[in-house]
Amino acid sequence: MNFETTIGLEVHIELKTHSKIFSPSPVAYGADPNANTNVIDWGYPGVLPTTNKGVVADGIIAALALHATVEQHTHFDRKNYFYPDNPKAYQITQSDKPIGHDGWVEIDVDGVKKKIGIAEMHIEEDAGKNTHERDYSYVDLNRQGTPLIEIVSKPDIASPAEAYAYLEALRQRIQFTGISDVKMEEGSMRVDVNISVRPVGQQKFGTKTELKNLNSFNYVQRGLEYEEKRQQQVLMSGGAVQQETRRFDEKTGETILMRVKAGADDYRYFPEPDLPALNISDDWIKELDAAMPEMPGKRRERYVNELGLTDYDAMVITQTKEMSDFFNATVALKADPKMAANYLQGDVNAYLNDKQVDLQATKLTPEHLAGMINLITDGTISSKMAKKVFKAITEGEDPKAFVEANGLVQLSDPAKLQPIIDDVLSANPQSIEDFNNGKKRAVGFLVGQIMKQTHGQANPQVVNKLLMAALQQ
């Protein structure tokens, strides 16, 4: 029996605003418990929320970035439920009039491109955080009221690999807008997953299960792969898949039953009475659209067509906005684009991985990287010398000053190199005889001796040219 899989993803993106969505409390990751709260966050009777205009703007930007239609006449709704981290006993969100709908992102899995639809996008407030210990439970309301955008996919995702690619594409586009850090490790991107399996040809969707504890894209894919196989095995054995919530165990790679869901939750949505409706003008949408930064697809196209990068190089450089912006700034300083791309993919990435830091947390600057690359391309230093220079610029040193202070300027003057070459040839007559007998390895030996005499500072290209001329006389 053959099966087809349907996967739905609900992604919560925390917006990078200075204050919360309905209160003036600051938004800051890692603050002391309940430090960033006020009476609105606590749900005191009689206090009134005020909509943060910046959050609405970010919602419009997200909709535009994901090719969605902006809902110009929208409002907020109350989603009613009781939980300790929700002191009002309701969440302010959007139900029937989300700020964006009918969008899409394009994914690429093994060279096959596919558009994944986005059903809708809601602006809403986050809840607080509960911490449970043996004898007590604690509530931290710092996160309460933090602005979120919930992005709900259409049932277009047909495999765990496609789910991973969708999340990558979504994160990338949102990150390039600058409205969120989209860091799962800090909670600014969270994913809820639904998956169902049905026999090929069956029109009705299978019974879905919800997966929890998915703290990385890798865990999302692994959890879906296990759950896909589990549901297939249940159906092949004649059983029926139950509507359940299951937890992914990262140690075993399995999903574990948490609870059986008897039916859909009833949150009794109704329009939020304390906030006015939102009327978004055409002019505001056009203004935000005009200010949108260049998206990754456009950047890749420009890198290939205008700067001569390969498709692969362009893809790697645009994995993050931080790396792409750094590349743009480096190339703007007249650095060779291909060399800049190679350094960012190679030495820079290796350095970041070794130090376990982001690019912005280092002392490396586009000015210093471009300066080093320009010293290589103009022949001032060799690629071998550049390794020392690279280490210096990661520590914040100016490349030109470092090269001059440490005597690393490459020796390229033929008038200074020729006597050294003559001395090496005089000291190695056997190598000259070997060369004349067709042994090409002799050239490598002689070059090595010349480099040794110059302490590695001779320009290899000039050395090779002068040496070959001398040998062929």
From Swiss-Prot:
GO molecular-function term, one example from the UniProt record: asparaginyl-tRNA synthase (glutamine-hydrolyzing) activity
Keyword rRNA processing annotated: no
E.C. number(s) listed in UniProt: 6.3.5.-
Cystine bridges: none
UniProt entry keywords in alphabetical sequence: ATP-binding, Ligase, Nucleotide-binding, Protein biosynthesis
Reaction(s) catalysed by this chain's protein: L-glutamyl-tRNA(Gln) + L-glutamine + ATP + H2O = L-glutaminyl-tRNA(Gln) + L-glutamate + ADP + phosphate + H(+); L-aspartyl-tRNA(Asn) + L-glutamine + ATP + H2O = L-asparaginyl-tRNA(Asn) + L-glutamate + ADP + phosphate + 2 H(+)
GO biological process, one term: translation
Similarity annotation: Belongs to the GatB/GatE family. GatB subfamily.
Assembly, per entry: Heterotrimer of A, B and C subunits.
Function per UniProt: Allows the formation of correctly charged Asn-tRNA(Asn) or Gln-tRNA(Gln) through the transamidation of misacylated Asp-tRNA(Asn) or Glu-tRNA(Gln) in organisms which lack either or both of asparaginyl-tRNA or glutaminyl-tRNA synthetases. The reaction takes place in the presence of glutamine and ATP through an activated phospho-Asp-tRNA(Asn) or phospho-Glu-tRNA(Gln).
Family matches, as HAMAP family: GatB
NCBIfam families, per database record: gatB, PRK05477.1-1, PRK05477.1-2, PRK05477.1-4
UniProt protein name: Aspartyl/glutamyl-tRNA(Asn/Gln) amidotransferase subunit B
Organism encoding this protein: Levilactobacillus brevis (strain ATCC 367 / BCRC 12310 / CIP 105137 / JCM 1170 / LMG 11437 / NCIMB 947 / NCTC 947)
